[in-house]
Amino acid sequence: ERILVLANIGNPSDAPTAKKKGAEGVGLFRTEFLFLDRQDAPTIDEQTEAYATVLKTFDEGAKVVFRTLDAGADKPLAFANLGAEENPALGRRGLRLSQVRTDLIDAQLEALAKAAEQTGRDPYVMAPMVATKAEAEWFSSRARAAGIKTVGIMVEVPSTALRSSQVLEPVDFASIGTNDLTQYAMAADRLQGELAELLTPWQPAVIQLVKATCDGAGDRLIGVCGEAAGDPLLALVLVGVGVRSLSMAAGKITAVKAALSRHNLEQCRRIADAALAACSPEEARTAALKLADPSVEVLVS
């Protein structure tokens, strides 16, 4: 099976570099750059131009995924301030902000549909912080009404991973944000350096949540766009549990492609099973390394 290797980017100017480094498309385009550090929301035309630029960088038919505005109390916007929250990581962020400020999401979806029309390309559009099927339905119907053909969600909340067969019903694809998924699964704040041991995506519980998402996804393409995708050894584990697209910082693409090229799907499944059987992140990594091609040790050192 072909595994797509894509890039995470935060600005249209990052797209050509990502392509040069071997990205087959974009697995996560963070649209926040258009919204942060300004007093007013960006216009539809301004957004359309940025989205069209990214779509045109890659070949026709390439997977280019736009994440709708992922802001909130932890990434406050001057023009969409919902007030201070004691625990912003669990507050009105991502899709929850969009449901309060429908004007922002509707303008963004209109701009993405216009960019698709202008370029003749079909963007993948996904919403962050979706926790229930009702939220997935809300976003899907709004996006499709705006003219978006390929609609998805981020899987960052354990409830979505555990109930993927239901939550993913209204959408066409999903992308797992392993950074937030780890934070929520392990009840450990990503910003607390002292909790680094809990926050590694090698946690067997996190790998199990990724597997649960893939197991319930039916024929939908499941990708990973968290830091986990850029680790050549962990990439093999992710493919082994059912992930079919990996998106990472452009600088990590070569090493991940090298690791993938040395393993077939059956080998990846065996590596994943060994990691899942482990009781700790260290054990999971050691077990995976033992079964991987020896060349991978050089790639991850």
What is each of the regions a protein language model found here?
Residues 1-301:
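Conserved alpha/beta-domain cores
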